[in-house]
C-alpha cells in the first residue's frame, strides 16, 4: 500500500485552516474529530470480541498476550501491559509490550527502528515466543515492517495473531489471523496518527486486556477483585471493593482483608459465606478463582 494513498495520511478538510483560528476553535476542531473515534471502534466490536475470545483461550492454556508496535503504537502496548499486574494481580510476564528500538524508544524516537524486520523477529525470539502465545501487532498505518515481520514469525510458530491498524486492507490486517481496523479517517494534523488513530488503538487495547481479565475471573460485578494494594489509594480501594461486594462495613472489610493477607477475592468469600480465610481460599481454588462460581454453585 502506497503511503500517499493511506487514509491515515490523507488531508482533513475540517482542519484545513486550523492555523488561522482562535485557540478555542482549535480545541473545538480537535474535539469534534475525536468524537468520531468511538463510533469507528463501535463498527469493529465483533472483531474485537473475536480477538478477546482467542486471547482468553490461549492465556487459559498457559500462553501470554504480546503487544508489538513501533512509536506511539508500541508505547500504547507497553502502557496497557504495564497496568495489568497492579490492576488485576497478574504476573508481570503475562501481558508483554514490545516496542521497536527497545526501552530507549519509550521516550525517544529511534531512527529507522520501525523499518527493521529483523528487530520485530528478534524481539519476539528474545522473549522466547511459543505457539501458546498471542501476538497483537499494532500499527496505525498497517505497513510497519517491524510489526509485519513479527506477525509473520509468530504465525510460522503457530501463534494466534491479531493486527490492529486504521487503514483497510493493510499488510498488518492481512498478515494477522484476526484484523481489527477502526477507520478514523484523516488526522487533524495530516499524518499525525498519535491523535485519532492512537486514541482508537488505546480504546481497542483497553477492551482486549479488560475483556481477558473479566473472562479470567479478575472482575466480580464491575469490581477489580485481584487488585494489589501497592499504595494508600489502592489500600482504601480494597476496603471499598469488599464493602461493595458484600454489604459489610469498613471495619469488617479491613478485618477480613487482614485475615487473608489482603486478597480481595478471599475476603469477599469469607464475608459472604461466613468462612475463615483458609476455607474461603480453598473454595476459590476449587473454582479457578471465580467468585461467581463459588457463590452460584455452593
Swiss-Prot record:
S-S pairs: none
Keyword Lyase on entry: yes
Catalytic reaction list: N-acetyl-D-muramate 6-phosphate + H2O = N-acetyl-D-glucosamine 6-phosphate + (R)-lactate
Sequence intervals crossing the membrane: none
UniProt pathway: Amino-sugar metabolism; 1,6-anhydro-N-acetylmuramate degradation; Amino-sugar metabolism; N-acetylmuramate degradation; Cell wall biogenesis; peptidoglycan recycling
Record key words, sorted: Carbohydrate metabolism, Lyase
Source domain of life: Bacteria
Residues at the active site: 83, 114
Enzyme superclass (EC): lyase
Family matches, as InterPro entries: Etherase_MurQ, Glucokinase_regulatory_CS, MURQ/GCKR, SIS_dom, SIS_dom_sf
EC number in record: 4.2.1.126
Single GO BP term: peptidoglycan turnover
Induction: Induced by MurNAc 6-phosphate that releases the repressor MurR from the DNA. Repressed by MurR in the absence of MurNAc 6-phosphate.
Pfam families linked: GKRP_SIS_N
Domain SIS: 55-218
Listed GO MF terms: carbohydrate derivative binding; carbon-oxygen lyase activity; ether hydrolase activity
PANTHER family xref list: GLUCOKINASE REGULATORY PROTEIN
Family: Belongs to the GCKR-like family. MurNAc-6-P etherase subfamily.
Further remark: A lyase-type mechanism (elimination/hydration) is suggested for the cleavage of the lactyl ether bond of MurNAc 6-phosphate, with the formation of an alpha,beta-unsaturated aldehyde intermediate with (E)-stereochemistry, followed by the syn addition of water to give product.
HAMAP family linked to this entry: MurQ
Function in brief: Specifically catalyzes the cleavage of the D-lactyl ether substituent of MurNAc 6-phosphate, producing GlcNAc 6-phosphate and D-lactate. Together with AnmK, is also required for the utilization of anhydro-N-acetylmuramic acid (anhMurNAc) either imported from the medium or derived from its own cell wall murein, and thus plays a role in cell wall recycling.
Subunit structure: Homodimer.
Protein name listed in UniProt: N-acetylmuramic acid 6-phosphate etherase
Top-level taxonomy: Bacteria, Pseudomonadati, Pseudomonadota, Gammaproteobacteria, Enterobacterales
